[in-house]
């Protein structure tokens, strides 16, 4: 017994029987010895018999439920049931619904599957309808000897590479390589890749820190081609592109190196300014203070007390919110608002002027409409003594800024550090809305600002530091008077005091950089190409272009300004 078992385990007599020819002969003899209908007993999804038909017994079994046959088998049964061995698509639908009632109420998804099987299965072939045969639609028949090389309606991906170079070039967006990773082969069979870099990559590829395009394309860093550009396509189909020949680790390293160099190149121009913004708190903390000034009572009462307390509470509802309604930085207001003294009306900057710091909210909203200027002009005539006292108290804390705080990078860094040491929880949020908008736009741009926005941000900080007393206030910058035409936002009488005219720009757009008090900004701003936009009551009205500050001739204005109010 044991000897027989050992001999059976070590016997290799069965090895010659496992040849391919013996297996085919065994399968052929089994199919001939089996019953004729044995092919119909196969499981769903298996290859169907081209000559299979549906018997009445099998049709009766599946009258109540879903049949177990695949869609290809159902199509085969339907076509073989016709005398001509061909059917149209509508006839196939009708035959399936008549023999299998399940599909009558099964929706239309199975019809899509029937169409896909007819189109993609190579066992089915479309036969054009003869001219003498009236009707609609082509016939479908069963191809007993399907051609494996016959292309279907939707060829696989490997057949797409058989197209001519002209067709592939026409499909690409620029007539060249469709993507940066498209491959081309030389006649020697060495895989090479031609990288068509976009314009952004071409701009940043200059400089010592950039990665060579050939190194990225070839998959290995440091390798570049000294010959001419290789042909984009090769018509020799014997050399197929193989992804196994590419070292993806080196390729991904090259792309990461290229991306890093592009970031360094793009941020080099803004490095001097954006680097000092890394230690700043988030933009929602950049609020100005007002409670410290309001807590200090004025030493003397106002001469005409025409500003009641209820109006202070209702004043914020007259215009947009201070933060949300702030105008953008890139649209400075026109320079046509001048006073009889020759000083710019909006020279005090984004918020209310220094003399109005005790009551900024009503004066801000009071200056929003032209007809509201007159009742709010007299309360603004208070002396600046409380402001001077508050500035002195703040300067005593050691937070005073140098006069040249924005002249170089080092002083600007120190200024930001001093601002970070402020108690931001005790600062009012409503006075310096333009500084909030400047910082919000800078954060949206990821602090990659151009020269114009950097200057605007410096001017906003300059005005904020001047108003809060952290930087000594210098004398106002006088300018020659603009043309005598005064816009509706500055339509005040010449007898009104200067602080009441400064309140007009509390909701206006920021003025040019050279109009603010204090030291000159880091970058000058040209005011000739700045189209002005003012905010009247609840809608935007475009302003006519404003002449340069030094223009001596007067421009006639035919616009009916009374229609705005």
Curated annotation (Swiss-Prot):
Residues 45-54, 187-206 have a biased composition (Polar residues). Residues 29-61, 125-233, 290-399, 543-565 are annotated as: Disordered. GO terms for biological process: cell differentiation; male meiosis I; negative regulation of angiogenesis; negative regulation of blood vessel endothelial cell differentiation; positive regulation of vascular associated smooth muscle cell proliferation; spermatogenesis. One of its GO terms (cellular component) is fibrillar center. It comes from the Eukaryota. The keyword Lipid biosynthesis does not apply. Its main location: nucleus. Residues 66-143 bind DNA. Spermtaocytes (at protein level). Expressed in adult brain, heart skeletal muscle, lung, kidney and gonads. Liver, small intestine, and spleen also show expression but at lower levels. In the testis, expressed from pachytene spermatocytes to round spermatids, but not in spermatogonia. In addition to the germ lineage, also expressed in Sertoli cells of the testis. In the ovary, only granulosa cells of the follicles show expression. In the brain, expressed in the piriform cortex, hippocampus, habenula and in the granula cell layer in the cerebellum. SUPFAM superfamilies: Winged helix' DNA-binding domain. This is Forkhead box protein J2. The gene is Foxj2.
